[in-house]
């Protein structure tokens, strides 16, 4: 204090330093915590704020923080609860190594006023380090002469932990030669050694593999291992040994010099120089040292002179083997050599007059070559016999002594074997006999006896329609088993007529590569299947050929937009005018948009969407997603606009989808005005009374005609059904073609187009479908029908169906037919018979119930084609007394409903084309008939409304 005054410091500054020093002493208290190493993130260490006497609310305000010089990120404080916790991995061995004490020093600093606290966190050791040896394998070299109880030091393991976790104990794997000596001083091993319990024998056990395991004292225990490889060093304590003590060898008298007589082999179980063996001749009896030699390194005994059977028949050779140890050790054996009298001249073979190559169509007994043999020996040793390679189509025929002919024994096939390597063997009669061989190569010349062959008799190809001209659609390949020009294959079309056009106008085939090209764009709507043949011809003489059938299926693409069908109140694509009474309730069907799509499958599956009104205003109408029926969403009231312009977007399910737009003009009128206005709209400039008379006349005519047809059809069908026997198969020629069907739900007529299937049998054919609806029991007189268009076909004459006739998806799902085809001979005959499906797609399907929608038959399947399906049983057929819900007037867009519905039902009223008249309930119609004066007023109002539209 006085020192500061001597330096000239003023009293105020001195007081400030004293104040700071006082705060420092107050806040410099020290806390102690402990935490185990490797603790997880978030592990609780201590309530540091509580232990320091700090309030939790003031930690943030006073800028509470923790600082450390070296390891500040290991621990962290939660300012919300004042708890010190582990922030990151703590490794004691990394922090403090082998030190007995390990701690982390933290400084806790708070401001306002400034205070510094010292926190000491002790890191406790856990047993997380196993014992580790410095080497994976320790090698020990021990001589086999070492005495028992000999000691061999080992290098111990180390443990990075401390105290009990680093206290190691050792154990040795079980063995009969060594034990482990591990004396301790109470804390750690002083010296680790192996003790030899039993003398080693290198010849029995050249090396030992032991496993030394070190275990620490932690909880749980951790271990470490090292492999001990003990190699036993050799001592020269074994003699060289031969395989046998005596050897017997037979040797020809004409054996040449350096001929190997015998190779001796002596082994010494010692190793190194103690196991190296040298050989030496001790004696040869009778006197024959000049006849044989012995290689001292490899033990080979060889002929060194000329042997003579008549001079000596046996030789006895004594051999010694000596190792290079100190002192050297030796082994002995005896070799007996027998001299044999042999046939020393081999036969000779000569092949002449070869007739090669041989054609594969050569006849048996054809002479291929002449063979002669000879032998310079005499007697039995000079008698020679010949033989040929077995299992070949050739044989040797002896013509006279020592002459043979090589002839063909059986037919040749070059495709199986194109060449033969024959071996002619000549053997004499000596003992042992000598032989000689001669090789004859016989090549088989090819003959064109194999036609080109395709991998399979028929190929199926799928091509998308609208392909570019010259498009490569397939490649045919035929293989000819012959060779050279006989295997050279060229391709061509099997030309024929497809209707009025040649096949070559559709496709072409490259003569060399076999690639098939489409010469023009294919149209799925015109041609679904193109069947033709491709011929493969070789270049042989005479040429051979074969055909393969190609079935080219033209896949549909979405290239046709939906087409709107003409209605009674407007043309296709034009606006349709509809009058709706304001008194109708929710769900009342206002109109129905009909459309067809010339594509197939999903490309022809249509959906309907009502476009939002201009200005975003909400309209009280909706359209069925798959039926096209426009109905009210709620009851109409006076607040609704008297006129609505509805835009219905018709969209198919192709990729990309194509659309069409229909316009429906809806006028809201009073309840009594709708029927009269509809009548005048239908009649146009004609008088209302004349229009109503025409409608009634046409309706009565249509009902009478259809009723007559239904009665006739039902009688004919019943007679055929009961007259048919259960064993009938296909219809005999001359029986009428009959298609009986039953519809479930509403069904309408759609556009029927002619589908051409081009096959190789005759000209293209067009499927003919005939529908014979059942006769209704009675027709409700008050049910409003539809008139039949003038000019309808005569009942006996076929007519192209009206474009407004098409089967709905729900109808197809529930429709089953019994089909009799005269030409194809297909007849339903009990279980297993053909089951006809009607894969057509219609825009006139009714609104599905409970959100169910009848899907299309499937993408790529034409909606107007016939598909015969052979199933395990027959579907239920409609009986003579069962009636369909509706029937169709052929050649007319009229669809007559004979369902018995409630009087107030408005369901499916839009399925009828009423020539501009909206159908009301029967109760409303009766009320309208009773009030003629009100009807005249409605006519005037309807005229005014139509003029406004």
From Swiss-Prot:
Q: Which residues form a coiled coil?
A: none
Q: Where is the signal peptide?
A: 1-29
Sequence intervals crossing the membrane: 697-717
Cytoplasmic topological domain residue ranges? 718-949
Q: Does the keyword GTP-binding apply?
A: no
Q: What is its main location?
A: membrane
Q: Which PROSITE patterns match?
A: CADHERIN_1, CADHERIN_2
Topological domains, Extracellular: 30-696
Locate the region Disordered: 753-807, 826-949
- List the Pfam families hit by this protein, alphabetically: Cadherin (PF00028), Cadherin_2 (PF08266), Cadherin_tail (PF15974)
User: Could you tell me the membrane topology recorded for this protein?
Assistant: Single-pass type I membrane protein
Q: Which InterPro entries match?
A: Cadherin-like_dom, Cadherin-like_sf, Cadherin_CBD, Cadherin_CS, Cadherin_N, Protocadherin/Cadherin-CA
Source domain of life is Eukaryota
Q: Which GO terms describe its biological process?
A: cell adhesion; homophilic cell adhesion via plasma membrane adhesion molecules; nervous system development
Q: Where in the cell is it found?
A: Cell membrane
Q: Output the CDD domains linked to this UniProt entry.
A: Cadherin_repeat (cd11304)
Please list the residues annotated as glycosylated: 265, 304, 547
Q: Name one GO cellular component term.
A: plasma membrane
Q: Where are the PXXP repeats?
A: 733-736, 773-776, 795-798, 831-834, 872-875, 890-893
Q: What's this protein's function?
A: Potential calcium-dependent cell-adhesion protein. May be involved in the establishment and maintenance of specific neuronal connections in the brain.
- Write the protein's name: Protocadherin alpha-11
Organism, by scientific name, is Homo sapiens
Gene designation: PCDHA11
């Amino acid at each position: 204090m006085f020192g500061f005054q001597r330096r000239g410091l003023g009293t105020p500054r001195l007081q400030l330093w004293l104040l700071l020093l006082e705060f420092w002493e107050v806040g410099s208290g020290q806390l102690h915590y402990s935490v185990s190493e490797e603790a997880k993130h978030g592990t609780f260490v201590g309530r540091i704020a509580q232990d320091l006497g700090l309030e939790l609310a003031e930690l943030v305000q006073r800028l509470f923080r923790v600082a450390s010089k070296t390891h500040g990120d290991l621990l962290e404080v939660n300012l919300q609860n004042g708890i010190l916790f582990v922030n990151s991995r703590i490794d004691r061995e990394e922090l403090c190594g082998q030190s007995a004490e390990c701690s982390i020093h933290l400084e806790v600093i708070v401001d306002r006023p400034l205070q510094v606290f010292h926190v000491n966190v002790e890191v406790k050791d856990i047993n997380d380090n196993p014992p580790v040896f410095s080497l994976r394998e320790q090698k020990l070299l021990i001589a086999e002469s070492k005495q028992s109880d000999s000691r061999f030091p080992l290098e111990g393991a180390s443990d990075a932990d401390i105290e009990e976790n680093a206290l190691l104990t050792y154990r040795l794997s079980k063995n009969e030669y060594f034990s482990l000596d591990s004396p301790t001083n109470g804390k750690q091993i002083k010296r680790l050694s192996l003790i030899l319990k039993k003398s080693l024998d290198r010849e029995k056990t050249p090396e030992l593999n032991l496993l030394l395991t070190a275990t620490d004292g932690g909880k749980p225990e951790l271990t470490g291992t090292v492999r001990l490889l003990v190699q036993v060093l050799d001592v020269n304590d074994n003699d060289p040994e031969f395989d046998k003590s005596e050897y017997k060898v037979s040797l020809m008298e004409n054996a040449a010099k350096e001929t190997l007589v015998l190779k001796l082999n002596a082994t010494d179980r010692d190793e190194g120089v103690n196991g190296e063996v040298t050989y030496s001749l001790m004696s040869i009896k009778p006197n024959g040292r000049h006849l044989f030699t012995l290689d001292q390194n490899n033990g080979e005994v060889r002929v060194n002179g000329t042997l003579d059977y008549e001079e000596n028949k046996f030789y006895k050779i004594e051999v010694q083997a000596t190792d290079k140890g100190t002192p050297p050790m030796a082994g002995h054996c005896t070799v007996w050599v027998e001299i044999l009298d042999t046939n020393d001249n081999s036969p000779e073979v000569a092949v002449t007059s070869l007739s090669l190559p041989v054609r594969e169509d050569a006849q048996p007994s054809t002479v291929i070559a002449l063979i002669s043999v000879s032998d310079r020996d005499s007697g039995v040793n000079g008698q020679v016999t010949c033989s040929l390679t077995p299992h070949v189509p050739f044989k040797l025929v002896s013509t006279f002594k020592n002459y043979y002919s090589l002839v063909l024994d059986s037919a040749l096939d070059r495709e199986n074997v194109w060449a033969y390597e024959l071996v002619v063997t000549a053997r004499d009669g000596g003992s042992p006999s000598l032989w000689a061989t001669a090789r004859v190569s016989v090549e088989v010349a090819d003959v064109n006896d194999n036609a080109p062959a395709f991998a399979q008799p028929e190929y199926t190809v799928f091509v998308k329609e609208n392909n570019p001209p010259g498009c490569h659609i397939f490649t045919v390949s035929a293989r000819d088993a012959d060779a050279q020009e006989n295997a050279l294959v060229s391709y061509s079309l099997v030309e024929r007529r497809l209707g009025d056009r040649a096949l070559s106008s559709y496709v072409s085939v490259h003569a060399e590569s076999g690639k098939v090209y489409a010469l023009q764009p294919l149209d799925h709507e015109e041609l679904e299947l193109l069947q033709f043949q491709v011929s493969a011809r070789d270049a042989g003489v005479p040429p051979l050929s074969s055909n393969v059938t190609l079935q080219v299926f033209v896949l549909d693409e979405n290239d046709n937009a939906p087409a709107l069908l003409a209605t009674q109140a407007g043309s296709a694509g034009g606006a349709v005018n509809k009058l709706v009474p304001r008194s109708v309730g929710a769900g009342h069907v206002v109109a129905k948009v009909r459309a067809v799509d010339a594509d197939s499958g999903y490309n022809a599956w249509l959906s309907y969407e009502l476009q939002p009104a201009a200005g975003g205003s909400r309209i009280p109408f909706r359209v069925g997603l798959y039926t096209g029926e426009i109905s009210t969403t709620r009851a109409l009231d006076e607040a609704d606009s008297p006129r609505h312009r509805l835009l219905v977007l018709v969209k198919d399910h192709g990729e990309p989808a194509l659309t069409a737009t229909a316009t429906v003009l809806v006028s809201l009128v009073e309840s009594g005005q709708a029927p009269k206005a509809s009548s005048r709209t239908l009649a146009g400039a004609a008088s209302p009374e004349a229009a109503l008379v025409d409608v009634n006349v046409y309706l009565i005519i249509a009902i009478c005609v259809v009723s007559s047809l239904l009665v006739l059809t039902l009688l004919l069908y019943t007679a055929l059904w009961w007259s048919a026997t259960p064993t009938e198969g296909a219809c005999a020629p001359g029986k009428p073609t009959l298609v009986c069907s039953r519809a479930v739900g509403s069904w309408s007529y759609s556009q029927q187009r002619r589908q051409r299937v081009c096959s190789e049998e005759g000209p293209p054919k067009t499927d003919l479908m005939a529908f014979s609806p059942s006769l209704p029991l009675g027709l409700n007189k008050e049910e409003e029908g539809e008139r039949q268009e003038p000019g309808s076909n005569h009942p006996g004459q076929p007519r192209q169906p009206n474009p407004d006739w098409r089967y709905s998806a729900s109808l197809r799902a529930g429709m089953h037919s019994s089909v009799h085809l005269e030409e194809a001979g297909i007849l339903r005959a009990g279980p297993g018979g053909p089951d006809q499906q009607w894969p057509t797609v219609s825009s006139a399907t009714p609104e599905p119930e409970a959100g169910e929608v009848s899907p299309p038959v499937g993408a790529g399947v034409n909606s107007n084609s016939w598909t015969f399906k052979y199933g395990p049983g027959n579907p239920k057929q409609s009986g003579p007394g069962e009636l369909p819900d509706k029937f169709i007037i052929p050649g007319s867009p009229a669809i007559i409903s004979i369902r018995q519905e409630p009087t107030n039902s408005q369901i499916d009223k839009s399925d009828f084309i009423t020539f501009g008249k909206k159908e009301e309930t029967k109760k409303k119609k009766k009320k309208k008939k009773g009030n003629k004066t009100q009807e005249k007023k409605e006519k005037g109002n309807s005229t005014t409304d139509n003029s406004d539209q």
